[in-house]
Design a protein with these regions (language model features):
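Membrane-cytosol interface at the C-terminal ends of specific transmembrane alpha-helices
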Residues: 136-175, 200-201
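Transmembrane-helix boundary motif in ABC transporter permease subunits
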Residues: 1, 67-95, 107-111, 159, ...
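Transmembrane alpha-helices
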Residues: 19-27, 96, 100, 149, ...
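N-terminal signal-anchor/first transmembrane alpha helix
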Residues: 5-34, 89-94, 100
Length: 261
């Protein structure tokens, strides 16, 4: 079979194809993005960058950063273990979280962690006389845990694609040079996997920023993120007041698109 090669197009045909390709970009991105810019500028000119929006931005940045780090670390360890053991069943099971809707995942965590909370609270109260209340539900820990379970598939998939570019001959050469598994992992694999890890981390960070169902159900009381604040404005019908939050999410989401293009 012969590989297909791109064919140059000129004249009217090229113009028509350009217009057809530009229409979805214009209607699906440029026009909405321009509207967000205009409305955000109006809100900043009128009321400035509010304290609530700043706090929501900091909450979003903190939660997404911690969740991204944990998810990448777990994914790296899982895929590396599969590399050495030649067994990928655990990585396949760990990737199932991405197929579960955020609402279903959040409800499942609420039920399981709620039962664990009550069991721990009862034990501490009867054995030590300490009343703790809920230790997991309604905390940032539960939300970060949900993010990690939800987006672990992105970490595993990205790192696996990086591992596919590392030939087994490199591992054999490292062993011949006296490296054990730990040395191969951190001195050989990790430096070669950095581009794949960074790409996966960017995608996970953006997904954590815009994850709404799990955040609404599991967030601590009085904690707002950019996604929940945007949802609150939309539910009140004040769409333009959520323009700044929406613009920030879009701008951060553009980073991996530009870098991965």
């Amino acid at each position: 079979s012969r590989l297909m090669s791109p064919q140059p197009i000129k004249g009217t045909r090229a113009l028509i194809l350009f217009v057809f390709g530009f229409i979805p970009v214009c209607t699906g991105f440029l026009i909405p993005f321009s509207h967000l810019l205009v409305e955000s500028y109006k809100r900043i000119q009128y009321a400035g960058f509010s304290e609530y929006l700043l706090q929501a931005s900091m909450n979003t940045l903190t939660l997404a950063s911690i969740a991204t780090f944990i998810t990448i670390l777990i994914g790296f360890l899982i895929v590396s273990a599969a590399r050495f053991s030649r067994n990928t069943w655990f990585s396949r099971i760990a990737s199932l979280g991405y197929a579960i809707p955020g609402t279903v995942l959040a409800i499942g965590l609420m039920l399981s962690l709620g039962a664990l909370d009550h069991a721990v609270a009862d034990f501490l109260e009867f054995k030590l006389g300490i009343s703790t209340g809920l230790l997991f539900l309604g905390t940032s820990f539960t939300l970060i845990y949900a993010y990690a379970v939800r987006f672990l598939a992105i970490s595993i998939g990205g790192i696996e694609s990086g591992y596919n570019r590392i030939h087994g001959v490199i591992d054999d050469a490292a062993r011949n040079l006296g490296q054990n598994r730990r040395g191969i992992l951190w001195r050989v694999h990790f430096p070669l996997l950095r581009p794949a890890i960074i790409s996966a981390a960017l995608l996970i960070f953006v997904d954590c920023m815009k994850e709404l169902p799990a955040t609404l159900l599991l967030r601590p009381l009085n904690m707002e993120t950019l996604a929940t604040q945007l949802y609150a404005e939309a539910s009140r019908g004040t769409y333009e007041d959520g323009a700044i939050a929406a613009l920030l999410i879009v701008l951060v989401g553009l980073i991996p698109v530009i870098l991965l293009a």
